A protein has these predicted regions:
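Gram-positive Sec-dependent secretion signals
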Residues: 1-31
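N-terminal carbohydrate-binding accessory modules
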Residues: 30-57, 66, 72-73, 162-183
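Active-site-proximal helices and loops of the catalytic beta/alpha 8
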Residues: 31-50, 65-70, 83-106, 125-135, ...
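Boundary/entry segment of secreted carbohydrate-active catalytic domains
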Residues: 36-60, 197-200, 577-598
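Aromatic- and acidic-residue-enriched carbohydrate-binding clefts of CAZyme catalytic domains
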Residues: 47-51, 87-126, 163-200
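An active-site-proximal structural segment forming one wall of the substrate-binding cleft
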Residues: 61-63, 70-78, 123-135, 141, ...
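Low-complexity, disordered linker/stalk regions enriched in Pro/Thr/Ser/Gly
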Residues: 489-572
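Aromatic-rich carbohydrate-binding modules that target alpha-glucans
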Residues: 526-528, 533, 586-626
Length: 626
């Protein structure tokens, strides 16, 4: 399309907004070795365990790929996908609540041929692209159970398995347990052979079953995957489970790890989901000799205490699982606490907890020494396969916490509190503050261990000072401060993530943080300068199926950052809704008859029109009229 056409497609309305400060990256080289950072403008770590992970819940592989620049800019070393296997009852419905759980009831031991996540080729393409950003991809694996045919008979294998795994289906009675009870913590057998989510439990001590899993892991590694999360790991037996013991973890992890090392020369990262405890007096050490594990009680407790304003208990340094920090995966919330009811400390479900409080809890769990932290990207109004419309995962506060984690790898930690302020100090030159009772706050804290000097809050840009061992400064309106010898970087904000849109046009709102001005341009058009906030409407001169590339920059006069977004205009689809007009109202009408529909409530910032004015020609139905 011609440049003039791109410019004509924009309708611009600007409003003055005072810029707030946002930060992105550097640190005092005397405290943190700059050679440890991925590049001058990146803090990403080389190893999964040293960085922070983004749980791209339900995102398709292509969606993740499209958002890799933003993910890297937000400081995530690793992205975790949803389960890769073929899900039970796959449909094209995008309803998250009705569909997400199907990914945890697999009907195959291969990367899915059809799912909301995409194809095997899509996964490979994602991994190839992620490598360019220094981002690792880990995949969720369901190997404890297989999909059921009937929830009233949890030992019944779904007949859908026959299509994808015919040999397994023939021997399904050999490869699944005969134990009738649901999984619970009352006995070792109930833990490791009970039915999870009313699904048939796999005979994971069987060599053939282990081979199915090992081959799945190798298939993923061949695509470029760098690690795995094992769903329901607690319910798969260990070598120490007596008469129920097996060599599953040894065989599966050794085979996958050696295969990965042969192909890459690096170490494979594996962690397993263990909720609350190992059950029946079993030990975490039976798992940690082979994998890292979730410590959900620690993260759950931090979130609960933050929401209750209990700074002192939110900063309890003890890991509730008792595992070493280097073996622990922490979170502020997970997909199960958000979509389900698995929370362990005050909240069984966390969907009612504000984004603000989740970020405050994240400030504590993600700034700790040696442990790995997982940030759950709340879906917002996104459909299955789509990018989260809740963009907290890449907010300035979360991004700066992530970068702090990355920069201070190896530094000592000190957790503490002062009044309503919880903190995690690292070494002698960095500290993260979380206000458990509000947002803006002036602080005066002694005993943090920080050396005397001046520091910057890389969230708000405010100056902090340590004099005679007392830290003073002001926390900004996020309730979080990330304080070290860092600098700020200009940042452009966009109200709509990359993806597709329906309707003739879509409206975006652009903003600035820590910047004096910015620019935007569509495809090859001339950049348009803006300050404050600006609304632009795109799409009117594009046909369905065409993709619009939007480039947005921000500058503070010294530094400039940029971000690229891609929007595809979708082909209009019939809704199945028909409108009939009462013949009595048609007496005064004159042909030709047209209908014009205008709806600005379809999505935030989106306007739907069935056609340009005067609309579409109406059709005469002899029985009911036009």
């Amino acid at each position: 399309m011609k440049k003039a056409k791109k410019i004509a497609s924009l309708v611009v309305a600007s409003a003055l907004l005072t810029s707030s400060f946002a930060a992105i990256t550097s640190v005092n080289a005397a405290e943190v070795d700059s050679a440890q950072t991925a590049s001058a403008d990146s803090t990403l770590r080389d190893k999964v365990g040293d960085g922070v992970m983004l749980h791209a819940f339900n995102w398709s592989y292509n969606t993740i790929k499209e958002n890799l620049p933003a993910i890297a800019a937000a400081g995530y070393t690793t992205v975790q996908t949803s389960p890769v296997q073929q899900p039970k009852d796959y449909s094209t419905s995008g309803d998250v609540t009705g569909q997400w759980w199907k990914l945890y009831q697999p009907i195959s031991f291969h990367i899915a041929e059809q799912s909301w996540l995409g194809t095997k080729d899509d996964l490979k393409s994602l991994c190839d692209e992620a490598d360019k950003y220094g981002i690792k991809i880990i995949c969720d694996i369901v190997s404890n159970h297989i999909a059921n045919a009937d929830e009233t008979r949890p030992d019944s294998v779904s007949n859908q398995v026959k299509k994808y795994e015919p040999e397994f289906y023939k021997k399904r009675r050999t490869y699944t347990r005969t134990y009738k009870g649901d999984a619970n913590d009352s006995s070792v057998q109930a833990v490791v052979q009970g039915h999870v989510s009313k699904c048939p439990d796999l005979v994971t001590n069987d060599t053939a079953v282990q081979t199915y899993i090992i081959n799945l892991l190798k298939e993923c590694i061949d695509c470029g995957v760098d690690g795995f999360r094992f769903d329901a790991a607690k319910h798969i037996e260990t070598e120490d489970d007596g008469e129920y013991a097996s060599d599953y973890w040894k065989n599966v992890t050794t085979s996958a790890s050696s295969y990965y090392t042969q192909k890459t020369g690096d170490d494979l990262y594996i962690y397993g989901e263990i909720l609350n405890n190992c059950g029946a007096d079993r030990s975490y050490s039976s798992y940690t000799k082979y994998i890292n594990v979730t410590d959900n009680r620690t993260g759950d407790a931090v979130l609960y205490n933050v929401t209750r304003g209990k700074a002192s208990t939110a900063t309890n340094a003890k890991y509730k699982s008792g595992v070493a920090a280097s073996n622990a995966v922490l979170w502020a919330e997970s997909h199960d606490t958000y979509e389900g009811n698995s929370g362990s400390s005050g909240y069984s479900n966390t969907s009612s907890v504000s984004d603000e409080d989740v970020v405050k809890a994240w400030a504590i769990v993600a700034s700790r020494k040696d442990s790995t932290a997982l940030f759950f990207a709340r879906p917002g109004t996104a459909l299955m396969g789509g990018v989260s419309t809740d963009t907290t995962y890449k907010s300035t506060a979360v991004s700066e916490i992530n970068k702090f984690h990355n920069l201070f790898v190896g530094q000592s930690e000190k957790l503490g509190s002062s009044g309503d302020i919880a903190y995690v100090a690292r070494g002698t030159s960095g500290i993260v503050l979380s206000n458990c009772k509000g947002t803006n706050a002036s602080v005066s804290i002694s005993g943090t261990g920080l050396a005397d000097g001046k520091y910057t809050d890389t969230v708000s840009g405010a100056e902090f000072t340590v004099a005679n061992g007392v830290l003073t400064g002001s926390i900004g309106n996020t309730g979080v401060a990330v304080v070290y010898n860092g600098t700020t970087t200009p940042k452009a904000i966009n109200s709509v993530e990359s993806g597709s849109f329906r309707g003739d046009t879509m409206t975006l709102t652009l903003g600035l943080e820590n910047a004096t001005s910015g620019t935007y341009c569509l495809d090859d058009s001339t950049p348009v300068k803006f300050t404050g906030t600006t609304s632009i409407r795109i799409g009117s001169d594009y046909k369905p199926g065409e993709t619009i590339t939007l480039t947005v920059t921000a500058t503070d006069g010294v530094k400039t950052s940029s971000m690229v977004y891609k929007y595809t205009k979708s082909t209009a689809q019939e809704s199945g809704v028909y409108v009939f007009f009462n013949p009595a109202t048609q007496k005064g009408w004159s042909a030709p008859y047209q209908v014009y529909i205008y709806d600005e409530t379809t999505n935030k910032g989106t306007v739907y029109k069935n056609a340009n004015w005067p609309g579409e020609a109406m059709t005469l139905d002899p029985a009911t009229g036009y």
